[in-house]
């Protein structure tokens, strides 16, 4: 707050302008032209310069170049699809896999009804919701790691 110039409300000129509904820009730093004409274009041009400079000076590849004559043995999806990919891959029936994936939002919808007497926002005071979140998180991580392994180790992760 020390940077902003505070109005002097004992000034009779300012009090007269404020009484008429004017004088709101009598104090402080005006947005025009200081911010809109000078600061904003500098920030925008600086952002463009950083993006273009990084693109020219340090280009990155998106992975291995595509080879139309050599198809990989197993095509993996993006990392955020690993749990559902592994679930569909491990379950023998595809309908069972789709129903298992539909069970996730259905389970999340039922949590507030199970815990409807508890109105707290603190997660430590909502044990059922916290338990559902923790179990779901660890299950998703487990299935995600298993998606990168061969199908015989996809569920056990090679531990047993």
Curated annotation (Swiss-Prot):
Protein name: Cytochrome b6-f complex subunit 4
Gene3D superfamilies per UniProt: plastocyanin oxidoreductase (1.10.287.980), Single helix bin (1.20.5.510)
Plastid keyword on record: yes
Purpose: Component of the cytochrome b6-f complex, which mediates electron transfer between photosystem II (PSII) and photosystem I (PSI), cyclic electron flow around PSI, and state transitions.
Matches recorded under PROSITE patterns: CYTB_CTER (PS51003)
Record-annotated membrane-spanning stretches: 36-56, 95-115, 131-151
Subcellular location(s) of the protein: Plastid, Chloroplast thylakoid membrane
Subunit structure and binding partners: The 4 large subunits of the cytochrome b6-f complex are cytochrome b6, subunit IV (17 kDa polypeptide, petD), cytochrome f and the Rieske protein, while the 4 small subunits are petG, petL, petM and petN. The complex functions as a dimer.
Record Pfam families: Cytochrom_B_C
Primary location class: plastid
Disulfide bonds: none
Stored CDD domains: cytochrome_b_C
GO cellular component: chloroplast thylakoid membrane; mitochondrion
Keyword set includes Plastid: yes
Keywords: Chloroplast, Electron transport, Membrane, Photosynthesis, Plastid, Thylakoid, Transmembrane, Transmembrane helix, Transport
Taxonomic placement: Eukaryota, Sar, Stramenopiles, Ochrophyta, Bacillariophyta
GO molecular function, one term: electron transporter, transferring electrons within cytochrome b6/f complex of photosystem II activity
Protein's GO biological process: mitochondrial electron transport, ubiquinol to cytochrome c; photosynthetic electron transport chain
Organism annotation: Trieres chinensis
Family affiliation: Belongs to the cytochrome b family. PetD subfamily.
Topology relative to the membrane: Multi-pass membrane protein
